[in-house]
A protein has these predicted regions:
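Beta-strand elements within well-structured catalytic alpha/beta cores of enzymes
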Residues: 195-200
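Structured, acidic catalytic/metal-binding patches in enzyme active sites
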Residues: 1-173, 184, 221-232
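A short, acidic, amphipathic alpha-helical segment used as a generic capping/interface helix at domain edges
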Residues: 173-190
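Short, flexible loop segments at boundaries between secondary-structure elements
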Residues: 205, 209, 213, 218-238
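Active-site metal-binding loops of divalent metal-dependent hydrolases
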Residues: 34, 202-203
């Protein structure tokens, strides 16, 4: 199942998919997120969340290790070459109850310690190099190619030299927590007529859909939302 589509014509798009199960009133809506996009994408997602009854949202607790791992996209905001913003959705403004089954600061710290000192040092070296390269020479087209690779289940392209260690910390361990939360919601509320939104990075959606499928949920509706166009708009004042 495709969650992020990259084409010349439509740019980068995210597939918002609704799942339901026969005999159950509960519906899940998955929102595959990209952490760097046009403001309109995040505004559209935020607006849609108002119609939900419960949200399942990602968000690793703040920690030095977490900041190091997320620096690759955080420091690309403000780049005039990309003209994109970091994901921001004000859940308190949305006003819908939400849960955050993600890594705690202590869990990130423990996972970071399991990675060798050599690899940790390389991360701190390579992420800034990647950021500088993207700010100086990067384009939306380059970023789109990276997102097409991430669609296959990889983590941040700046960390691709260390797939095993970092996949476990930033992907698989978080997937397990997310899947556990989905199972709990199904078990406790499957007979309620509610709409549950799952707002997580697109790389986590393979685990989400696999869990929903095993529980008997099937897609019943889907639509594309544009994350960003490949070619940014040109200002007539330039």
């Amino acid at each position: 199942m495709q969650f992020i589509e990259v084409t010349e014509l439509c740019g980068v798009r995210s597939a918002v998919i609704t799942f339901r199960r026969a005999g159950s009133a509960l519906r899940f809506v998955v929102y595959p997120m990209v952490h760097l996009g046009e403001p309109g994408f995040y505004a559209e997602v935020e607006q849609r969340l108002h119609s939900h009854d419960l949200l399942v949202v990602e968000g690793v607790a703040h920690s030095p290790a977490g900041r190091a791992l997320s620096a690759a996209y955080r420091h690309l905001e403000g780049s005039s070459r990309l003209a994109l913003v970091v994901q921001r959705i004000d859940l308190h403004t949305v006003g819908v109850p939400f849960i955050n089954p993600d890594l705690t600061a202590e869990a990130v710290k423990d996972g970071w310690r399991r990675i060798s000192l050599f690899q940790r040092a390389l991360v701190r070296l390579l992420v800034p190099v990647y950021v500088i390269q993207m700010r100086l020479f990067g384009t939306r087209r380059v970023l789109a190619r990276h997102l097409a690779v991430e669609e296959q289940g990889d983590v941040d392209p700046a960390l691709n030299d260390f797939p095993d260690a970092f996949d476990e910390l930033m992907l698989h361990s978080r997937d397990r927590l997310l899947v556990s939360a989905i199972h709990a919601i199904h078990q406790e509320r499957c007979m309620e007529q509610i709409l549950v939104g799952v707002i997580y990075g697109a790389e986590h959606m393979h685990a989400v859909v696999d869990a929903l499928w095993r529980l008997g949920y099937r897609p019943c509706d889907a639509e594309w939302l544009t994350v960003f166009d490949i070619d940014p708009p040109v200002s007539l004042n330039d």
